[in-house]
Amino acid sequence: MHGLAKAPKRLQAEALFTAAMADAAENLYLNEQCIPVYRGEFWTAKQRQAASIHEVSYRACFKPQLPAYFISRLSAPGDTVYDPFSGRGTTAIEAALHGRRIIANDINPLSAILTQPRLAPPAPAAIAARLAAIDLDVQSTVAIDLSMFFHADTLREIAALRHYLHTRHVDGDEDAIDRWIRMVATNRLTGHSKGFFSVYTLPPNQATSAQRQIKINQQRAQTPDYRDTRALIVRKSHQLQRDLDADQSKALQTAAARARFLTRMADDTREIADQAIQLTVTSPPFLDIVQYANDNWLRCWFNSLDAEAIAAGITMSRTLQDWNQSMARVFAELYRVTRINGWVAFEVGEIRKGKIRLEEHVVPLGTSAGFACEAILINEQRFTKTANIWGVGNNAAGTNSNRIVVFRKT
């Protein structure tokens, strides 16, 4: 039995979450618990422009302002911040920029490939020099047909770069510059502008199949044109680093030396010690909305990874009961690794057209694991174009929301 009722703002929540910014405070009555709910625009692009180093395309990721909000309020410099579903590494990168230690976990190895190099950005001149030294004219075998995406000369360069990076990695010679080039190339494989290696296709966070691309080419009467892979990698490298100042670069380098990247199920992170984490900021997979293998098959090919094997290990619960059971195990593990008075900010959403509000399921999962649920924050922002992230629709016409359940270990 649950419901919402107007209630006075609680002083503790005001102190922690600057509730003066909220339009209203409510109570959610859920399983005999009274949870304060705060709605408002808690962070905006104007309040804090996200650093350019975040600009890596990845399906289903929150904006950097979300982890920044909690990192700045619920942790201090030197504390460890964690994300068990790291994705493109938004929490890890933002925590590093704030001077925190970081641990990032994701069962998908592409997560570390896209995140770790951005903690140690090489100088653009060094990137250009390394690319110039790689022989991209060498013929390398490509076992799958990618002619619907790439011009033959572009594909030759991609295959040669893939072979070079794979050899460097296997031989143990891969360095920070190689890892950076791998990260940028992975991000530039396919997209909908001249900044990508491919002919026009879906945005890079929505990879399409070879069969679907053939239809796109037919519909647009297009054929793949040549793209200079070296030039595009250098260009994107400049874009990623364009607004990094000396303090931010130092913060990233400091975090890089101590950063830990895990590739495990989120409910079994045995490498993390008990009570090691001050703050977790994360957003788990939501039921069956995002199909990782379909989205990442080409990125996996470029990085010599088995997309189907990776997908088999990713939580894609098709029923709410299965999802609850999976998240219950995750919360038990989060309770183990969280220090006393540490925090978890767990971002969920309204899914299936608002028929399921996952926060109402997450609250009892967290409290059953031992956490105290301190509040639910619903960040509401106006937008001017259609938004649909994670399959999460708009809570009302003209607004988009993040729904974050905030727990504390007492």
Locate predicted features.
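Mobile active-site "lid"/loop adjacent to the S-adenosyl-L-methionine
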Residues: P285-V330, N341
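S-adenosyl-L-methionine
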Residues: M1-P77
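Conserved proline-anchored active-site loop of SAM-dependent methyltransferases
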Residues: P64-P67, D79-H98, I102-P109, T115, ...
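Conserved phosphoryl-transfer catalytic core
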Residues: P109-V170, L305-G313
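SAM-dependent nucleic-acid methyltransferase catalytic core
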Residues: T167-L279, L287-D288
